[in-house]
C-alpha cells in the first residue's frame, strides 16, 4: 500500500549549503520532517553542482514522517545575472540605464537549460518568456 501524503513544501536552497538554520530548519521542523536527514540527502544530491547555486526543491512529506524531494533548475533570474555578469537587475527597468546586455544565443542557452521547468510548447516560446524576464530586470537583449 502506498504511503499517505501529508503535504508538500516548496523551498529554494543553495546547492551544497543546506543546514538546519532558518529558513530550512523551521519549515521542516514544524512539519515533523527530520531536518538533518534532509540536509544530508540534499547536500549529497547537489555536491556536483556549483556551490551556492539556488535550487528550487519540492519536498513531499508523508504521515509516517518520511519524505521525498525533487529538485528543479535554478531560477531564470539566476541564469540571467550569471550570463550578463551582474549582481542585481536595474532599480528602474525600462527607464534608467540598462543593467547589462544579453545576446539571443545566451537567451537560447538559458531556455534550453530551463525548458523542462517552463510552461512553453517550444524553444521559441521559452525564449520569449526569458526575454521578458530579462527586460523586467533591466537587461537589453541584442542580436
Curated annotation (Swiss-Prot):
Q: Which GO terms describe its cellular component?
A: cytosolic large ribosomal subunit
Q: How is it modified post-translationally?
A: One or more lysine residues are methylated.
| Keyword Glycoprotein included in the entry's annotation | no
* Superkingdom assignment: Bacteria
User: Any idea which UniProt keywords this protein has?
Assistant: Methylation, Ribonucleoprotein, Ribosomal protein, RNA-binding, rRNA-binding
**What start and end residues bound the annotated signal peptide?**
none
A Gene Ontology molecular function term for this protein is:
structural constituent of ribosome
Q: Which GO terms describe its biological process?
A: translation
Q: What does this protein do?
A: Forms part of the ribosomal stalk which helps the ribosome interact with GTP-bound translation factors.
- Family named by the database record: Belongs to the universal ribosomal protein uL11 family.
* Self-association state and partner proteins as the record states: Part of the ribosomal stalk of the 50S ribosomal subunit. Interacts with L10 and the large rRNA to form the base of the stalk. L10 forms an elongated spine to which L12 dimers bind in a sequential fashion forming a multimeric L10(L12)X complex.
Name the UniProt record assigns to this protein: Large ribosomal subunit protein uL11
Amino acid at each position: 500500500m502506498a504511503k499517505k501524503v501529508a503535504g508538500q513544501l516548496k523551498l529554494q536552497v543553495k546547492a551544497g549549503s543546506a543546514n538546519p538554520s532558518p529558513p530550512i530548519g523551521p519549515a521542516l521542523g514544524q512539519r515533523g520532517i527530520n531536518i538533518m536527514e534532509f540536509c544530508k540527502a540534499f547536500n549529497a544530491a547537489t555536491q556536483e553542482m556549483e556551490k551556492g547555486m539556488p535550487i528550487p526543491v519540492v519536498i513531499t512529506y508523508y504521515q509516517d514522517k518520511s519524505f521525498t524531494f525533487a529538485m528543479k533548475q535554478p531560477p531564470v533570474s539566476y541564469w540571467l545575472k550569471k550570463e550578463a555578469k551582474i549582481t542585481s537587475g536595474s532599480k528602474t527597468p525600462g527607464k534608467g540605464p540598462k543593467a547589462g546586455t544579453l545576446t539571443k544565443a545566451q537567451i537560447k542557452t538559458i531556455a534550453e537549460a530551463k525548458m523542462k521547468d517552463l510552461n512553453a510548447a517550444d524553444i521559441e516560446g521559452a525564449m520569449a518568456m526569458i526575454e521578458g524576464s530579462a527586460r523586467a530586470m533591466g537587461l537589453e537583449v541584442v542580436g
